């Protein structure tokens, strides 16, 4: 019995060290948000010059897409420098009719598509071959609302030399439920301590699935080919492998609708976790090799990011081990100490692993 207790204790502290090291990495990198940004990491203001295509993949979105299109029609950007394209796929409602009524152009998928990544791949190929006049592509989800200055600020990023950029993703419905409030807090923390911090470090921000811009040159050079359930972070991994910095554009704001119920949130988080693990299996080795060989910091950073679901599982194992250890006669003082430690870990993991 004593030997078993010693083994469990060694395992617990070993895993605890792994978790806290992971937390410490994000804590330290997050502190760079308070650092003064260097000139090379700043986005300057420019006159609108970039012609952009706004791409919206839509599946049965007739109830929400109209609001997005109205906000896009109100952009503080020359009308001759952007067009809105809606790509209906597998729809059984009148999404296409609503989009047309708001002035959007329609691209019909002529190949079978099962995911947003499939739709984007088809659309990018279509745009390169049929609409070469556009210099950049903006991707939105159909339930978004876009700030009037969005395109102008993304134009600034493109003119500043960035070829991929992520917006400031905010929440459209933060007060509708405690779930949507948690999402709102998460994105505030992620934008500040992750994206803005990395922008000041000269690293890459994350891509959050909506409100991001890709230069036409990037698509022409490498295409857009994703196979996992999370096409956004998979594309971010591909950018890291190619030393393509992703800018964070704080003043380009997208308001995104968040889940209201725990079941809806669980379904979404499950998909994100599965997709992240798929990306980890596919890219982690390549990212670490790229970091070791070429010294690209965002490759290392992205490799650690993919470990988030694993860290969540390890945290559960630690809690379970404590329970078993307690049954075997753990001191009450140790239980209290762990409860305090676990509270601190939970606060950290709310940011790291959400």
Please provide the spans of the model-predicted regions.
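Cell-envelope/extracellular polymer assembly enzymes that use nucleotide-activated donors
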Residues: 50-53, 83, 234
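A conserved acidic beta->alpha catalytic loop
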Residues: 88-96, 111-113, 145
């Amino acid at each position: 019995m004593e030997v078993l207790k010693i083994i469990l204790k060694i395992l617990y502290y070993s895993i605890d060290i792994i978790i806290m090291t992971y937390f410490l990495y994000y804590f330290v990198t997050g502190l760079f948000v308070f650092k003064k940004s260097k000139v090379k990491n700043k986005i300057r203001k420019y006159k609108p010059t970039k012609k952009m295509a706004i791409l919206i993949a839509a599946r049965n979105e007739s109830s929400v897409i109209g609001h997005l299109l109205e906000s896009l029609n109100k952009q503080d950007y020359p009308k001759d420098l952007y067009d809105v394209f809606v790509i209906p796929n597998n729809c059984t409602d009148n999404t296409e009719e609503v989009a047309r009524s708001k002035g959007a152009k329609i691209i019909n998928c002529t190949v079978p598509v099962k995911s947003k990544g499939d739709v984007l791949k088809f659309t990018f190929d279509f745009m390169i071959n049929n609409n070469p006049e556009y210099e950049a592509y903006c991707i939105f989800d159909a339930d978004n609302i876009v700030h009037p200055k969005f395109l102008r600020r993304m134009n600034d990023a493109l003119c500043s030399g960035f070829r991929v950029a992520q917006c400031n993703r905010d929440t459209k419905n933060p007060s509708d439920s405690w779930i949507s409030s948690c999402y709102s807090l998460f994105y505030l923390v992620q934008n500040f301590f992750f994206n803005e911090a990395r922008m000041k470090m000269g690293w890459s921000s994350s891509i959050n699935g909506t409100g991001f811009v890709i230069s036409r040159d990037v698509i022409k050079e490498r295409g857009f080919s994703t196979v996992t359930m999370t096409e956004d972070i998979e594309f971010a991994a591909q950018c890291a492998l190619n030393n393509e910095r992703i800018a964070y554009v704080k003043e380009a704001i997208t308001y995104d609708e968040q889940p209201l119920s725990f079941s809806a949130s669980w379904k979404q988080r499950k998909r994100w976790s599965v997709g992240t693990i798929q990306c980890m299996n596919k890219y982690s080795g390549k990212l670490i090799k790229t970091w070791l060989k070429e010294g690209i910091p965002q490759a290392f950073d992205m490799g650690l990011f993919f470990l988030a679901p694993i860290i969540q599982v390890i945290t559960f194992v630690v809690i379970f081990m404590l329970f078993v250890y307690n049954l075997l006669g753990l001191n009450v003082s140790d239980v209290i100490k762990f409860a305090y430690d676990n509270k601190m870990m939970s606060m950290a993991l709310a940011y790291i692993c959400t």
